[in-house]
């Protein structure tokens, strides 16, 4: 038991140190700063940004969405089994079967997606309502013609950047807490180390991409450092929570609430990935095949990590 506790404390420190290192590197190392880059250096950073977009895509689909769907399905199955115990007749079994087959996980993820959509729409309405509708329309459609065949496709509005960055950090924070919680709840040393290594690889890639993203949208060093520090603390906090409840039985309501929160976080993450990160990285038509390869490589990294996560 003492060995297991020591391993988990070591994992906690490793998560904190690695996350801080990976997140702060693209913020404070001048080589990663897009504003000062020219020529070949600028192209390399652009392709690196596409790779980070693939990492976000893989994290959203292969990790956050997959884990949310699995968790919600498992909790719904437990709920149906507990409520159908002792029931008689085929009608009750058929009703329970149809109850389980409903796509609750997809519904929760979609609710997270539409929640951020609504939040952003309200923010834009408040910001641009006094200026009239023409300003917003020109901002959104001024850079494109006839289904995007103009040479300068539209990119996401800069006014949306801070809000979407905040949504990205919040969704990642939720997910990081649950990742740390999973490590803290492991019952053996081998399982703890295996899961921690997978989380370290996943977290390192994602947080590096977050640091790169914060630098590209012009976030100040102090605010970017605060964001990375907050994100770095989430997995250790989750692991510490797992240590406190490891050995105690978790209630059904607690498990369902965790699964629902993971689903909402996955939906918000997918919204930011598809409507902010990918469009911004692919807006420039330069070297489209190279950008595709980098996005695919980033996704492949996360898909490979999913074998052990």
UniProtKB/Swiss-Prot annotation:
Residues bound to Zn(2+): 175, 179, 202, 276
Effect of deleting the gene: Deficient mice do not reveal any specific phenotype, however these mice are more susceptible to abnormal embryonic development because of zinc deficiency during pregnancy.
Membrane topology value: Multi-pass membrane protein
Site (Critical for the pH sensitivity): residue numbering on this chain: 63
Pfam family, one: Zip
GO biological process, one term: keratinocyte differentiation
Disulfide bonds: none
Secretion signal span: none
Predominant cellular place of this UniProt entry's protein: membrane
Keywords: Cell membrane, Ion transport, Membrane, Metal-binding, Transmembrane, Transmembrane helix, Transport, Zinc, Zinc transport
Tissues expressed in: High expression in the liver, skin and ovary.
Extracellular side: 1-8, 65-103, 186-191, 247-258
All ranges on the Cytoplasmic side of the membrane: 30-43, 125-164, 213-225, 280-288
Location within or outside the cell: Cell membrane
Induction summary: Up-regulated upon the induction of differentiation in cultured keratinocytes.
Family stated for the protein in its record: Belongs to the ZIP transporter (TC 2.A.5) family.
PANTHER family: ZINC TRANSPORTER ZIP2, ZINC/IRON TRANSPORTER
Function field: Transporter for the divalent cation Zn(2+). Mediates the influx of Zn(2+) into cells from extracellular space. The Zn(2+) uniporter activity is independent of H(+)-driving force, but is modulated by extracellular pH and membrane potential. Transports also other divalent cations Zn(2+), Cd2(+), Cu2(+), Co2(+) in the order of decreasing affinity, respectively. In the skin, aids in the differentiation of keratinocytes in the epidermis.
Protein name: Zinc transporter ZIP2
Native species: Mus musculus (Mouse)
